[in-house]
């Protein structure tokens, strides 16, 4: 039974006797709130609503969520778009994709938090910044979605990143599809380098930080979990 209804990302903390729980909830484009609820889902007490007034006084604007299709034309992908706070729809902006392909998670924020600052700050330099999921990403989507990249950790998410950028440019005149960059850390660094090598005519710039570019030399527990065992043994083992 769903007790904390609403289209939010939530963090819950039950009491020791499980009669009550604290429900913290928000989306990337809503103010965080916290309620005390009882075990049947009734709000017992509204505890706190974050005060973002000082933030908005600086010109802050919430990011926007979007949905697009994967490169297969069927699978829905979800993402967030961050704009400059002085955004002008009559201008053309270069597009940056901040990526982390998974497979154990994705680089898409689901709730309002300070973790969004790295994307907001980049947008203030005059970019449209997006994050989005890709097939082979978060296991919460489905077993098929999560396993899509098994055995192919380099390429599995690239086509989706390119195709979604093209869809957004078709929707929004303010996106300059001729100026697309990609960047990320760790698996995102691995992906950004692969992206500019596979699609050099599309991705004009890539920034790679701490990329695991050769997974045969990376943490074996991670590589073998998501790629499979790459070692070959002879009759002597």
Predicted regions and their residues:
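Surface loop/turn motifs at the tips and blade-to-blade linkers of beta-strand repeat domains
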Residues: 3-7
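Serine-hydrolase catalytic core recognition
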Residues: 9-237
